[in-house]
Amino acid sequence: MALCGVCSTPNLPNLQVFRSVRNSSIGYKRNHSLWQLRSSSFRAKSVIFHCSSSLRQSPSNVEEIDDNPSVSLEDESAHVMQFKWSDFRILDRVSIGHGGRADELVFEAIVQVPDSPLFNQGVVLRKLNTTRAQRRGRRAIEVFKKLVRRRLLYHSYSMQVHGYITNNLSDDQYSFTLVHGCHGSFSIRHWLQQSDWIPTLEATLALDEESFRRVGDDTTGGPAVSRQLRLIRTLMRDILIGVNYLHSHGLAHTELRLENVHISPVDRHIKVGILGNAADFNGDVPSTSNAYSTMDRRQMMIAFDMRCVGFMMAKMVLQELMDPLIFAKLKSFLAKGNDPSSLREFFVTTLNTNSESGNTGVQILDRNWGAGWHLLSLLIATRPSERISCLDALKHPFLCGPRWRVAPSMDIIRWGLGSTAVKISEEYIYRMPQRQRLAHFIGLMEMLNPYPKPNCWLELLPGRWRLLYSTGKHIGLTLRQPSTRALIGNVHLTITRASESINNTSLSFTSDIRFTAITSKDWPHNKIGAAGKLQTLSQFRLIAGKRLYLKEEKKNIGKFSMGEPDAEEGLAEKLETEKWKKVVPFKEFPSSLPVAKLVSGEIEVTMNMNDHIDSPGSVIGEVRKQIPPEMFDLSKLVCGTYIDSRLLVLRCVNGSALLFTRSSLDHKSM
């Protein structure tokens, strides 16, 4: 749907450009006495900007005449159409996707002017009744005139603004009616609320093999997870291209929501909504500002748009977030300062994942070694400077199909190793192949530790960590008949820093083991018993250290042993391959690696039980058999070998490793 002609010269309110004393940027002021302006006089005179300021200006700034015909005001205004109410046939319905705000009246109409290039086409009329709403409408026209120079991209990724309706003498002179394109009946939010949205949206977008090849995939059909992933890739790439188009023109959308994004059934492109609140990167910059502050403003506005895109992606993948209550939990999770890299831990415990096939959205984000979680964490990162840009997001593995070869960064490689280790630990089938793979992945993570210095550990260690896996001995209940059975719940390690001082390296470690003691002879089906909590508290000092890799002959390990058979030897063979030589920062297996050494102090152990039991000693003994001994005796923790914003690996005296994930669970949760 292209703009092919003009009805008449626009009759927008005359804009007088002024330069304020405090603000050197150019602003706009409406002159009510010049509300009506004849088109003949408008075209006959040159466009002169009168600028005034108490500061001394150069002569070139006092009076500026733009002689470039390609960017003249008259040429830009030629694309804005001027309508009358009689030019439309108002329909008796309004599609749900065009719902307006409280200060708007929304109509759907058909253009009835035979000479108009929009003849017999559907449009949307937005009557803006308040000053703030009118400001949005006029801003949308200003942005349209700025972007229309590149019509192809504008028409493909932005909702088309055609013009406005002039006011008759009998009409309210302060009302303003915007005329823009009608791109389907639904916004993306309303599409996702349909029960059969996947096949319906596939049909609307006319997705075929050629369409999927554009996102790096050459398959069609398949299970619902694969179909939804291909749809999300298509929609997200279109959204990012449209948002990047705005950012490259010095504009930020500032209102990116699912309700404002539409899908056109004509060109099958995403329309990023009316740009009534679009903001200029360089607008309203104080005169005392420098290039750094201008760039900082630009980054902040781009980061705000990327955060909005991240929320849109989260709702498209995890449709439970369409519920305002669940979405409020997500906003609260982020507002409390939790790192977005631990979103998976939050969602798995918040969403309903008890169905037979699991949660579809979680499965989509888990694919490709957790690439979806990585992209989502970058889009809604806590610090604006850490959020990903549109161009980098378009090259992210999650949005690139299997046929596209994407060179992963070191950060993505570490993320993939950690995500794979987490997935294996969740299977809870700890036979020898799984144990070998987990030990192998943990060893690779330690080789690629991004934060070897103790100062980084002091910043990242504080928090609440949930135990995922131990490479040491595992003693369960299958082959034993204990007198008192204990069902282990969550095991957490809470680390707090004594002081924020740089020289203070003291840390407080608290091991929190929650369990249920079952005193009956046989296992009951409902697993009801006396709830208890075992806590161990110890103080640690953090200093720099090294972990030595001793090159000595390995002893043969029996078939039924629970140790780590040739973990370091297999790791050394892996690092010698051509694939890993390009990734690891060293050419051969190192003899030592820097670690964060932990020096422990005294230990304090407490146990609380909700109900009275006859033999608390036997309960403690049973709990100690099932958990890693290092979680009971914290003095056996000797060093930290890997840490990032999501995962933690601690090594023990006997050489075993403990894998933790950062948790935001309530202290009262089991």
From Swiss-Prot:
Its main location: plastid. Not autophosphorylated. One of its GO terms (biological process) is response to osmotic stress. It is found in: Plastid, Chloroplast. Signal peptide: none annotated. One of its GO terms (cellular component) is chloroplast. Expressed in roots. Induction: Up-regulated by salicylic acid and down-regulated by jasmonic acid. Residues 1-52 form a transit peptide. The keyword Plastid applies. Transmembrane segments: none annotated. One of its GO terms (molecular function) is protein kinase activity. Residues 88-399 form the Protein kinase domain. Keywords: Chloroplast, Plastid, Transit peptide. Pfam families: PAP_fibrillin, Pkinase. PANTHER family: PLASTID-LIPID-ASSOCIATED PROTEIN 14, CHLOROPLASTIC-RELATED (PTHR46699:SF6), SERINE/THREONINE-PROTEIN KINASE STN8, CHLOROPLASTIC-RELATED (PTHR46699). Belongs to the PAP/fibrillin family. The protein kinase domain is predicted to be catalytically inactive. Directly regulated by DOF3.6/OBP3; unknown function. This is Probable plastid-lipid-associated protein 14, chloroplastic. It comes from Arabidopsis thaliana (Mouse-ear cress).
